[in-house]
Amino acid sequence: MNGMNTAPYQDFAREKLGFEFTNLDLLITALTHRSYVNEHRKSVHHHNERLEFLGDAVLELAVTEYLFTHFSEPEGILTAWRAALVRTESIGDAGDKLGYGPLIRMSKGEKNGSERAHLQILANAFEAVIGAIYLERGFDDARDFIHKHIIVKLDGILESGSWRDPKSYLQEISQRVDNQTPIYKVLSEEGPDHDKVFTLGVFVGDNIMGRGIGPSKQVAQQQAARAAIAKYKESGEK
């Protein structure tokens, strides 16, 4: 690719994915954010959004197939489990652990973006890498990759109950334990209108049980609810 040093990408493929890409451009494109193309229009022409589109479909199929063949729960439960496995936080965390963050080509502005924005970039790149593996090696290898880095999270998700809608789950717990309904309050609101960051607290009675931060009040509420659920679980409640 235009004289760039591709060795780190092949090293990553060999060490983290377990094989070398015959078409290394696929992997490099999977790790190229749209913003980088915008800054280098003369030399770079492809970003990872098409591969992300493909990888998203492969990821959903592989997870769906695994859940269908290994569990007998009804559709609604399996759908909730799948959603927990493939949500941004889950696949972004998988990407972070794989360690390809430094290899992602992005603009200077994106490099200095919020933690949430960085997590989204990692998650999108993870799906794009799945798409690249699918095109390079086929569905079986893509599925093996997904099992190794995503399906492995399932036991923890089931044990923690994080597959449930966190706000509904918290309300069940708080009403059972404290006979009270959680109340969500905005603690702070920062940033320009196009890049807001909300911090919310969830209160049960006069006690703040959890805090959450997110780009919207809804996301922050969900994070706060998860924190409150974890606090209840630490005290032995389920």
Residue ranges of predicted features:
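Double-stranded RNA-binding/processing signature
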Residues: 1-238
